[in-house]
Amino acid sequence: VCIFFENHLMRGNRTTKMNAENFNAFRSFNYPVLAEAGIHIKYNNVQIHVNGEERELKPHYLLDTNVVVLKLFPGIQENVIAAILGIDGLKAVVLETYGSGNAPRKEWFIRQLCQASERGIVIVNVTQCSAGMVEMERYETGYQLLQAGVVSGYDSTTESAVTKLMFLLGHGYTADEVRDRMNRSMAGEITL
């Protein structure tokens, strides 16, 4: 799936809407543009992956929407985290962290994440930044998240991480299987 907008062709699972008013509204920060249209169309053939076989488009309707996005912010309190992680039926959280995957070092925060992971809630770490990636082993706080059962979202967009989780959960994968598959590219959504 691609997005063609304002003369640019971009991978849908690598693209984020950045502006609600301008024509140049979509950006693909962590993956090159596939083509640019002007007088001539300039294709970025190296980045265009062709399967080699023609197949009929098969939409996937089995999505489990018991997924939330939790954006961290300075001063976030335990009751907020506990309320979100305690949502009835919650199966996965996309945790938007600072920079390359950093989060509060507070004991209660790590404890809440550990308890949620132990209950089978999949927690995926993505950066709040427009570009770049999560590197959980780079800093102590990221390493603590790993110890709490949080998995890296690498350079995934928030939108792509949510969709991937909904797809995997909707197809009946267990929490451990989902955690494992979040570390693999299914459709070019992350760079490994």
PLM region spans:
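Core catalytic loop region at the nicotinamide-binding pocket of NAD(P)H-dependent oxidoreductases
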Residues: 1-3, 176
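Accessory alpha-helical/coil subdomains and C-terminal extensions
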Residues: 2, 11-100, 105, 185-192
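C-terminal non-catalytic interaction/assembly regions of soluble proteins
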Residues: 97-192
